[in-house]
Amino acid sequence: MRYNAGSYDIVVIGAGHAGCEAGLAAARMGCKTLVCTLTLDSVAMMPCNPNIGGTAKGHLVREIDALGGEMGVNIDHTFIQSKMLNTSKGPAVHSLRAQADKKKYQERMKKVLETQENLHLRQLEVVSVEVEDGKVKGVLTKNGAFFECKAVIMTSGTYLQSRIIIGDVSYSQGPNGLSNANELSKSLIDLGIDLRRFKTGTPARINKRSVDFSKMIEQPGDEEIIPFSFISGNIDRDQVSCWLTYTNEETHKVIQENIHRSPMYNGSIKGVGPRYCPSIEDKVMRFQDKDRHQIFIEPEGDDTEEMYVGGMSSSLPEDVQVQMIKTVPGLENAEIMRTAYAIEYDCIDPTQLKASLEFKNIDGFFSAGQINGSSGYEEAGAQGIVAGINAALKVQGKDPMILTRSDGYVGVLIDDLITKGTNEPYRMMTSRAEYRLLLRQDNADFRLTEIGHNVGLVTEERWNKFKERKQNLERELERLKELQITNKTENNEKIVELGSTELKKPIRMYELIKRPELDYFSLACLDPERPDLPKDIGDQINIIARYEGYIQTQLEQVAQFKKFEKKVLPEDLDYNDVNSLRIEAIQKLNKIRPLNIGQASRISGVSPADISVLLIFLEHYRKTGKNTDN
């Protein structure tokens, strides 16, 4: 029986990585927030890989943290290994990755939600979102409780009508043996929301006691632990190792002989899978020239024997999985504790969303995370914090926070989803960011903390720490640009000792740092009055000095980009009325409804010629007295 259960400013549907960030952001901004989850035991659950960060994903975590989110702080408290990836490459692609203790990660995040002022965490299944006159009115739960609210954030992950597939066995269930949600999809369809079917998967978990690590290559963490959060400070902690092994011809033979039993290849799976995280059977069949594939054996926590078999995601039958795993060096006697599986689920077409992550046609209804067609904990968390901030701003009667492609990877992620859409689970990569030298993980706070403070999410403690860090960097850069190093014999002897060439004339310290064989730290011997600063300040100085020319070039590109972003398109424009646009462009523009010329130019099917037509139209529109330039 239906009953009125109370009213909230904001209701969040789901408490995965998107839901946690959304709920915390909304509550911390002063909104009375209800976070609903199918089970309280799955808050911030990591049903697949036991790590946070990685290439491009580490950037997202740093940006979530810079805005005032929780993911970075949470992993800093609960990681069991820390590693900086891509250190042999340029700073734009350096990415932090941390192995998590999955249970401790969940437990701490749940505690944060439970103790957050303005936030109510409840075990409830939402079966419908109720809308009246195009505006959200509330949500109805399976138990008949109706919660009135001003905004709803849907962060339902991979649970909507989800189906587990293992070989020829399939059944209705959520990830990791949990129940799914089979009723909410109908409510979304009734609201006119387009759904599609995606697929993802996870590898088996094996018992640590059954693994022969002597046949594998040890992968220890870094000696120097770099935290994800800008407010975590120095971390000193014992770390565990991961282990590397490889598939071989025997592994591939087992897969090839049983490929007809794979639901990926016999048509049982209809959903589209992730291109950049293929199953082991997909890798073996698609890349038959490769005689081996990497397999990482990763611990899932300090208090469990479960090991994650990274690189071996599969939907093959259980008996084939056993054969396959036992062919891998070190896994000959492996005992499977959890079987690998594929999971199909409903998700939305994200082009139905605005840049604020609010549905275009439903006032007050936001969506974030894997329900939007993305993959990964970090992509989910990034969307979650944006949706949470914007739902709170909506309730407060304020303008939304819109992050652009030049603001951060979060902006790139959202712009790609809402502008281009996705036909497969979307994964963030550094190659997707055209301004990646500006969007480094080390400067996320310089790019986004002020934005987080302006919307009311960043705490005063974090804000004061940021201001001190910014002041330290700016003062030190200014000092280095003024400090002159003379070419006297004593200085030249030290420079030669460092492997560089003598000075012919005096030079500023800032210019000397640009020499590839020197850096800020090694030149301390020529700088006796140098202030005692944190190491990360020195790291930033090295990057700023060495890449100054490239950074300036990208800043100029951003200035050009922003010119197009400022050319705002009328919200109510019918593109059928714009003369000379091609039919495909008219269809795409009417569907996506871009905010500005910049976004329009990134829509697939809109050509440079179409953009020229729109620019002429806007100029005429402006001259007739309607201003479209902010």
Curated annotation (Swiss-Prot):
GO cellular component, one term: cytosol
Transmembrane parts of this sequence: none
Compartments, record wording: Cytoplasm
Pfam families, sorted: GIDA, GIDA_C_1st, SAM_GIDA_C
Main localization of the protein described in the UniProt heading: cytoplasm
The keyword Flavoprotein belongs to this UniProt entry's keyword annotation: yes
Annotated positions binding FAD: G14, A15, G16, H17, A18, G19
Keywords: Cytoplasm, FAD, Flavoprotein, NAD, tRNA processing
Gene Ontology molecular function, alphabetical: flavin adenine dinucleotide binding
UniProt record, GO biological process: tRNA methylation; tRNA wobble uridine modification
Cofactor(s) demanded: FAD
UniProt keyword tRNA processing present: yes
Entry binding sites for NAD(+): 273-287
Function in brief: NAD-binding protein involved in the addition of a carboxymethylaminomethyl (cmnm) group at the wobble position (U34) of certain tRNAs, forming tRNA-cmnm(5)s(2)U34.
Sequence similarity: Belongs to the MnmG family.
Quaternary structure (record): Homodimer. Heterotetramer of two MnmE and two MnmG subunits.
PANTHER family hit by this protein: GLUCOSE INHIBITED DIVISION PROTEIN A, PROTEIN MTO1 HOMOLOG, MITOCHONDRIAL
This protein's name: tRNA uridine 5-carboxymethylaminomethyl modification enzyme MnmG
Species per Swiss-Prot/TrEMBL record: Clostridium perfringens (strain 13 / Type A)
Lineage: Bacteria, Bacillati, Bacillota, Clostridia, Eubacteriales
